[in-house]
């Protein structure tokens, strides 16, 4: 089984440009779709997860369901699959920062802003739940 891709590598038709984030289960990259010359976010799961047949089947099924979601608060999925025995999801790249970085940079946010942002996240989770998906890593 191959290791995770490195910046500059070609992976499943995508050229890895930068690492956007790392977690216990995956690495998210900024990548270029080589067929369309478009920028995407590429999430590649840890190699040890791809070797677990139960996890692999669940991942592929949940990815198909997630790709069917059409909601303004849900990032669209463009592609998913397996490459060099690693599981991946290609999705819309959204530039900017996450909530943790925003608070770190700006300090506390106003309660009205927090409610607005939490409301958007809740609507996205509700759309997923209606399709039978449960997000396992809400922070």
Residue ranges with predicted function:
Residues 1-139:
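Conserved ATP-binding/catalytic core of the eukaryotic-like protein kinase fold
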């Amino acid at each position: 089984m191959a290791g995770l891709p490195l910046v500059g590598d070609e992976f499943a038709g995508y050229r890895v440009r930068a690492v956007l984030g790392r977690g216990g289960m995956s690495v998210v990259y900024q990548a270029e779709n080589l067929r369309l010359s478009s920028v995407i976010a590429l999430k590649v799961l840890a190699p040890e997860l791809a070797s677990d047949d139960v996890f692999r089947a669940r991942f592929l099924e949940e990815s198909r369901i997630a790709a069917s979601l059409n909601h303004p608060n849900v990032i669209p999925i463009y592609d998913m699959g397996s490459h060099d025995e690693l599981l991946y999801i290609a999705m819309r790249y959204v530039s900017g920062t996450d909530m943790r970085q925003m608070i770190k940079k700006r300090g506390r946010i106003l309660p009205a802003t927090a409610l607005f942002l939490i409301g958007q996240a809740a609507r996205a989770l509700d759309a997923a739940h209606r399709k039978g998906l449960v997000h396992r890593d809400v922070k």
